[in-house]
Regions:
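Short acidic/polar hinge/loop motifs at secondary-structure boundaries
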Residues: 108-136, 155
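Extracytoplasmic beta-strand/coil segments of soluble accessory domains associated
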Residues: 66-108, 130
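Transmembrane beta-barrel wall of Gram-negative outer-membrane proteins
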Residues: 171-202, 207-244, 282-283, 287-299, ...
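Gram-negative outer-membrane beta-barrel transporters
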Residues: 418, 530-532, 552-655, 734-736
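Short, acidic, small-residue-rich periplasmic hinge/interaction motif at the N-terminus
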Residues: 20-58, 97
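Conserved C-terminal beta-signal and adjacent last beta-strands/turns
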Residues: 235, 413, 472, 575, ...
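Face-selective signature of the C-terminal outer-membrane beta-barrel domain
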Residues: 281-440, 461-465, 517-518, 522-530, ...
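Membrane-embedded beta-barrel scaffold of Gram-negative outer-membrane proteins
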Residues: 294, 300-306, 463, 469-475, ...
Length: 737
């Protein structure tokens, strides 16, 4: 039991080998075939780690999936509201969310336009999953936007043999409450099964207006026998959160680190007020129908039809006028309330086939997808137009986007000798994008283009003496700009009078070399990576008006580093795990283009820019050092105590290595204590989670802006940061049978 508790608490933190955390041993089962075609296996020369269902369920109940994965090697996670519930995001090796390919049961969850995954839209996802594989580097071929530094491969496909039920209730700081319930029939003798789960989470959040009211539901109805599997899966997410994406500046941070300017305005008497519906709201449905067929013992075919429907909006108060509003008869000024909505449909057909012999595994697949999204703007109220104006009949703007993709790959793993595996993976991606109509500042966003990509991968892995493994691999990847990248580039070109509005797709060569040793009490691994970029789409440090990072092409850059992992288990009741990453994240001959404004008083863009040259510069939000250590004790049967610490080095908020525009290094520690009681029927678990136990006052993410004032040539800048909560607590009670 002690060994099981140690594994459940720690395997999520440390990949047992460089290639993976150990064999899953289920790739031939029908209930896992739907995801195995895009996952790396034990001998695949890809850097990855595995996280099981038990490990995911052992994290704090308020943590989103990025926060649950934050102790993985080279992973950094942050929450906008300062806690684990609500808007969260993560990076891997400094690679941002829009460059991380995320799949659920082999189907991409990345939004087709922004390429992001908005984890808040699927709350409590970790409680619904049977396993997660985190690949670092270009990884294996997968559907959807190509991985450009990391992949997160998630699975709900795990059929339990017997009926089950569970309830988890959590309560903690900032009036945070979570409830998760799950039940399933298990597989009947006729092969039928049904699983259902639902969750609810509410919190006031740490900073003002960081409240969250989120819910999710999951259902799977299926049938399987020895040769066939048919499964219908539904995943639902609903979120209502306060807007927090602006962060706060340093002066505000020093005065009140819980301050949030969102929705702030002055009334007629000069008093500070806050709009009470400064919110972000979104509902999403995912529906998957999968059929899998096993022909003989060697050939397997799986096909999935997937549909995502999303509908939501954000609403906020803008205490300043703006002109040129599309859909209105006249310009107007003064305070106003806007609502910007998104309505989208995403349809995917994915089909894979796998053939396996004793020495050869051959996998091929095709994915076809289409996305149709409408971006709709409405003015809810304006003090210029008054309360009696017919706002419903006047649409502010309508912008449409259609994106189609075709994706085909073939992958082979061949073992010419028992101690060696050769790997090759060839992928084609074709992408077609059409945008039409203006957005909130009346800039026309009519744009149409297509991209064709070829992404080859190859590698070798070696095994000897039963405890040593090594691998080497090379891969080429391409990735197209996202909608937000194109939109902001068009706007900047429009405002500055430039003609070229195109952004180039980025290209990467990823070289990986790894070694791992696994002993009875000690395990250790080292992985070296060289991620070489051309035409890299890199953040400038600025954010759009809705919190998207604005990017630009840079000719040449690289991320080069070493990832070290180790574990030591001197006794059955004690284990230590650690990982450490050292990296260089550089841009060659970086040039910064700063937009000029006329005067301090007018602050009107002149269409001119000032150029600064920095030589080889460090990429923003890419710490050169990060690491983790965790100790786990099992003092007596069915009890566990663990303490962990995460260190993240200094991060710059832009690409200029300016100390005043940077996030200082920080260290944060967490403690958990748990015990499980056996009952007449089922088990009762109690757990206490103490986050940030040393009460460190730190911030983990941010952005910056800058302009040149032409009247005196001065550079004026500012930053926005996201304070994280001081010491906070969560209690969880779990009942399972």
């Amino acid at each position: 039991m002690r060994g099981f508790l140690l594994s459940a608490a720690l395997a999520a933190l440390f990949p047992g080998t460089v290639q993976g955390a150990g064999p899953e041993g289920i790739v031939d089962k029908l209930d896992s075939a739907v995801v195995s075609t895009s996952r790396a296996g034990e001998s695949t020369p890809v850097t990855y780690s595995m996280v099981s269902r038990e490990q995911l369920q052992s994290v704090g109940p308020s943590n989103s999936l990025p926060m649950a994965l934050s102790l993985q090697p080279s992973v950094m996670a942050v929450n906008e509201g300062g806690t684990g519930l609500g808007y969260s995001k993560m990076t891997v090796r400094g690679v941002k969310g829009s460059q991380i390919n995320v799949t659920l049961n082999g189907i991409t969850l990345n939004d087709a336009e922004s390429q992001e995954v908005f984890w808040v839209n699927i709350p409590a996802l970790s409680s619904l999953l049977s396993s997660v594989q985190v690949q670092r580097g270009l990884g294996t071929s997968a559907s959807g936007p190509g991985a450009f530094g990391a992949s997160i491969n998630m699975s709900t496909a795990s059929v339990r043999p017997e009926a089950y039920a569970s309830v988890d209730v959590g309560y903690g700081s900032y009036d945070t409450f979570t409830l998760t319930a799950a039940a399933g029939t298990g597989k009947s003798r006729h092969g039928l099964y049904f699983d259902f789960a639902c969750s609810k989470g509410v919190t006031d959040g740490y900073i003002r207006n960081a409240y969250a009211d989120v819910a999710s539901a999951y259902a799977a109805l299926g049938w399987m026998n020895d040769r066939n599997s048919l499964r219908l899966t539904w995943l639902y997410g609903d979120q209502h959160t306060g807007i927090t994406w602006n962060g706060i500046d340093l002066h505000q941070y020093e005065a009140d680190r819980r301050y949030n300017p969102a929705g702030e305005y002055y009334d007629a008497f000069g008093n500070v007020r806050y709009y009470d519906n400064e919110t972000d709201n979104y509902t999403q449905h995912h529906l998957q129908l999968n059929y899998t067929r096993l022909f003989g013992e060697r050939l397997l075919w799986t096909t999935t039809l997937h549909w995502t429907y999303g509908d939501g909006y954000y609403e906020n108060y803008r205490p300043a006028g703006i002109s040129g509003y599309y859909g209105f008869d006249q310009d107007f000024s003064g305070d106003f309330i806007i609502r910007e909505a998104l309505l989208n449909n995403y349809l995917v057909l994915n089909s894979d086939v796998r053939y396996r012999t004793d020495a050869l595994t051959l996998t091929a697949g095709v994915t076809l997808s289409g996305y149709d999204g409408d971006h709709i703007g409405k003015v809810q109220w304006s003090d210029f137009l008054g309360d009696d104006y017919d706002y419903a009949s006047h649409e502010w703007y309508l912008n449409t986007g259609i994106k189609k993709e075709s994706n085909a790959f073939i992958r082979a793993e061949y073992e010419p000798f028992r101690w060696m595996t050769a790997y090759a993976d060839l992928q084609y991606r074709g992408v077609w994008l059409d945008m039409a109509g203006p957005e909130d500042d009346n800039v026309p966003l009519d744009y149409s283009t297509d991209w064709q990509f070829f992404n080859p991968r190859a590698g070798l892995s070696f095994r000897w003496s039963g405890s040593h493994k090594a691998f080497m691999s090379a891969a080429v990847g391409h990735r197209e700009p996202g909608r937000a990248d194109i939109k902001e580039n068009i706007k900047n070109a429009w405002l500055s009078g430039h003609q070229d509005v195109s952004l180039k797709p980025e290209r990467m060569l990823d070289l990986e070399f790894g070694y791992a040793f696994t002993g009875e009490k000690v395990s250790a691994s080292a992985n070296f990576y060289l991620m070489e970029y051309w035409d890299m789409l890199l953040e400038t440090g600025k954010l759009s008006n809705v919190g998207y990072a604005i990017k630009e092409n840079v000719d040449r850059g690289w991320r080069r580093g070493v990832e070290l992992c180790a574990s030591y288990e001197p006794f059955k009741w004690l284990r230590a795990d650690a990982n450490l990453t050292f990296s260089l994240n550089k841009i060659r001959d970086y040039k910064e283009y700063v937009q000029n404004v006329d005067t301090y008083e007018n602050w009107t863009m002149t269409g001119r820019t000032t150029i600064y040259e920095y030589g080889n510069s460090t990429m923003l939000m890419s710490p050169s050092v990060m690491g983790m250590m965790r100790l786990t004790f099992v003092p007596w049967k069915k009890s566990a105590v663990s303490i962990d610490g995460k260190y993240v080095g200094r991060q710059y908020l832009d690409n200029t290595m300016t100390l005043s525009r940077s996030i200082p290094s920080y260290f944060v520690s967490n403690l958990s204590v748990s015990h499980t009681f056996d009952l007449n029927k089922g088990t009762l678990g109690l757990a206490l989670y103490v986050n940030n136990i040393f009460n460190n006052m730190y911030y983990a993410d941010g952005w910056c802006w800058k302009n040149i004032i032409e009247e005196d040539g001065a550079l004026v800048d500012g930053i926005g940061i996201y304070p994280q909560a001081p010491v906070n607590y969560m209690l969880k009670a779990s009942y399972r049978f």
